[in-house]
């Protein structure tokens, strides 16, 4: 679990040449809740030196950014149900699962995440590689048409 701290580090880039913080949509001044992250998550992000992100110590109401790392479909369901109730309108939930090539034991695929998220009123809007082990799927609350 990340503590509420100010983060300053050097930018790192992934496969696309785009820093992970940009792919995920981190912005300076935002608050974020991250759960189950790999030990090198902060260095993977590669936030700019002047970026300030507040890491929430626990899930709370009206969150604007959540990133869950999990290998378990049952945990995914429990956590998404909880986050869905707490995410702000326009907020983002990233779910990361191990790539098959990582050989990390998991019962989650990209389709599993959609199967759980869509009935909850969440829609997937983006996918990205987090690192050599983790992929990520960006979810948002489905907007109701007027």
Question: Residue spans of the language-model regions?
Answer:
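N-terminal, charge-rich interaction modules
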Residues: 5, 9-48
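Short acidic low-complexity segments
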Residues: 52-63
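Short, glycine-rich nucleotide/cofactor-binding loops
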Residues: 66-76
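N-terminal and secondary-structure boundary signal
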Residues: 74, 83, 142-146
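Mid-chain, well-packed structural core segment of small domains
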Residues: 78-107
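Conserved Class I S-adenosyl-L-methionine
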Residues: 108-124
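Class I S-adenosyl-L-methionine
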Residues: 121-146
